[in-house]
């Protein structure tokens, strides 16, 4: 791991220039053209793949084909991550949108290669498949990947229909996702601050002020802004879900959860058990919300109260705000308390400018971690507004980055892991931060604040995410009968929130239009971007408890689990 110095400041802007040439330059255009030509050539080769069986030159031909697949997929990962980073940091930039669209237009070629690969693997007999895989070190090293792709073929339309669907998706389902990115990226929220009306990006809006009037002002200003694009977002949501349902119907899938579970390498029984246990036991969180309401002087909390600081949770004379430099340092220190390897990694990522955290207008909402396969690096995006919740977000995203770092020397095809296991690494990092802070806290004010944040996280993963799941599930059920207007979508959201939160919030304190503001519903390539968070949270909580019993050997065992996420199904991996 590259050395870093203790005196290096943690800058708030990431370094993208060392990864690829700027998208506006000729060098980037040359790389993009080379990628396009490479895909075209590989797509043609994929039409003539030999049988996946021993004998003749089949093994040599397959290794050569898969190595070229590997090279181009690594480049695809880099290009997509690179332009995604630029677009997130400068949401209004039309050039970045054009490059995103250009990359999306190449997806049918990737899909053609993938389809031909999976059909060839599917057509191989079990004995031939095993014999050829075992005969070559490269194939044997990627046996899990090949088996997964073989399994994927069962969820494919006939070849011609599959390729047509991929072509149509560029200006169909994925275009609706890009439309949402543009609408939300252009959105500005007008709020009153110190007697002046100022415009902010959604990611700059905070609900953690100790003054309820400020939280209300921010909430209603945000609600008004999001409502202005609700009808367009309803169109996007309807067509994203409608496209999926059409595909599922053509595939003969009776349950719209089959595909999300397949993508997470997870059994339906695991999902059902998880929600069943949570539903039975989250009454304790209802008690927490009621206690917090009493401490805030409210009969029940409103949506905008859930992140409010508790009275007395701030030590007299101290500010509840935490500057980025201090927050980043806190993450490094707490990570180091778990393992030197994790701490050194976080320090390296921060000092080498892997993180974009500046609080400024013009950025997209949300936070993410994305990887650059050829560079063996990651980049983290967020907007740091000087809150302890932001520190948790930073830890969360660096947990993702550490996961990729641990896998960086594995075969590229075994560096891909499902979202539920991805969220295990990120939420484990949050747990390390929170538990270490709690252990080190000295005053009752500090302990109270940390416990409040930990319980608020539990509400987020076990109630808020549950509401998203219930909403998306019922939305898909109703969407099967036709499109839903924005008003009906909001009704579904309200019902899901009340059920998931056990009606713990005030009657006028819900957020029916939450579906408009939540990016996760509009990610066209990942349906049900919700339950994996809860799975990861529960698993990471259990892992942290085990770490307290296992002693000094646990960090290495944890690394072993992260490696297993790229080459195993979910249940066996854990």
Please give the residue ranges for each predicted region:
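Long, K/E/R/D-enriched contiguous segments that form extended
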Residues: 295-337, 343, 403, 450, ...
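Conserved helix-loop functional segments at active or binding sites
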Residues: 333, 337-344, 370, 400, ...
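Post-HExxH zinc-binding segment in Zn-dependent metallohydrolases
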Residues: 418-446, 454-456, 460, 536
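Short pre-active-site segment immediately N-terminal to the catalytic Zn-binding motif
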Residues: 318-324, 375-395
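A well-structured
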Residues: 1-317
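Active-site recognition of the HExxH zinc-binding catalytic motif
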Residues: 252, 385-405, 426, 431, ...
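C-terminal, non-catalytic "cap/extension" segments appended to globular domains
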Residues: 2, 6-10, 17, 23-24, ...
């Amino acid at each position: 791991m590259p050395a870093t110095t203790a005196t290096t400041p943690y800058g708030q802007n990431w370094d993208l220039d060392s990864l690829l040439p700027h998208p506006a330059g000729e060098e980037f255009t040359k790389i993009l053209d080379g990628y396009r030509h490479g895909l075209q050539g590989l797509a043609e080769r994929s039409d003539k793949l030999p049988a996946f069986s021993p004998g003749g030159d089949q093994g040599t031909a397959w290794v050569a084909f898969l190595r070229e697949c590997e090279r181009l997929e690594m480049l695809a990962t880099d290009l997509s991550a690179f332009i995604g980073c630029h677009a997130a940091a400068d949401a209004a930039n039309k050039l970045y949108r054009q490059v995103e669209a250009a990359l999306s237009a190449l997806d049918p070629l990737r899909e053609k290669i993938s389809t031909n690969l999976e059909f060839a693997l599917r057509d191989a007999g079990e004995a031939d498949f095993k014999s050829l895989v075992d005969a070559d070190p490269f194939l044997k090293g990627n046996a899990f990947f090949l088996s997964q792709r073989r399994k994927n073929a069962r969820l494919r339309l006939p070849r011609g229909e599959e390729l047509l669907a991929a072509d149509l998706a560029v200006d169909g389902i994925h275009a609706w996702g890009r439309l949402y990115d543009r609408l939300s990226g252009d959105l500005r929220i007008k709020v009153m601050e110190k007697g002046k009306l100022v415009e902010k990006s959604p990611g700059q809006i905070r609900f953690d002020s100790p003054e309820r009037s400020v939280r209300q002002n921010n909430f209603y200003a945000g609600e008004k802004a999001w409502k202005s694009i609700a009808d367009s977002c309803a169109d996007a949501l309807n067509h994203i879900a409608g496209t999926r349902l059409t595909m599922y119907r053509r595939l003969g899938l009776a349950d719209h959860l089959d595909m999300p579970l397949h993508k997470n390498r997870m059994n339906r029984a695991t999902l059902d058990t998880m929600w069943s246990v949570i539903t039975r036991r989250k009454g304790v969180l209802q008690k927490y919300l009621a206690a917090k309401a009493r401490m805030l002087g409210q009969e029940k909390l409103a949506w905008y109260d859930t992140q409010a600081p508790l009275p007395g949770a701030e030590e007299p004379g101290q500010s509840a705000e935490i500057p980025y430099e201090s927050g980043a340092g806190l993450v490094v220190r707490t990570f180091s308390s778990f393992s030197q390897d994790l701490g050194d990694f976080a320090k390296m990522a921060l000092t080498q400018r892997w993180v974009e955290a500046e609080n400024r207008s013009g950025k997209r909402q949300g936070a993410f971690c994305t990887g650059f396969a050829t560079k063996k690096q990651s980049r983290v995006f967020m907007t740091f507004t000087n809150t302890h919740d932001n520190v948790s977000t930073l830890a969360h995203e660096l947990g993702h980055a550490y996961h990729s770092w641990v896998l960086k020397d594995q075969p590229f095809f075994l560096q891909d892991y499902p979202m539920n296991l991805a969220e295990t690494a990120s939420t484990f990092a949050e747990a390390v931060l929170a538990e270490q802070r709690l252990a080190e806290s000295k005053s009752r004010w500090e302990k109270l604040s940390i416990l409040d944040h930990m319980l608020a996280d539990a509400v987020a993963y076990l109630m808020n995410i549950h509401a998203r799941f219930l909403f998306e599930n019922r939305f898909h059920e109703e969407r099967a009968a036709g499109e839903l207007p924005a008003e009906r979508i909001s009704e579904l959201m309200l019902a899901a929130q009340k059920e998931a939160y056990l009606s713990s919030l005030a009657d006028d304190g819900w957020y029916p239009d939450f579906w408009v503001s939540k990016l996760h519903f509009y990610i066209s390539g990942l349906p049900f971007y919700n339950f994996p968070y809860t799975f990861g949270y529960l698993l990471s909580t259990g892992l942290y408890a085990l770490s307290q019993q296992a002693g000094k050997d646990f960090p290495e065992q944890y690394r072993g689990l992260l490696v297993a996420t790229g080459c195993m199904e979910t249940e066996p991996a854990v």
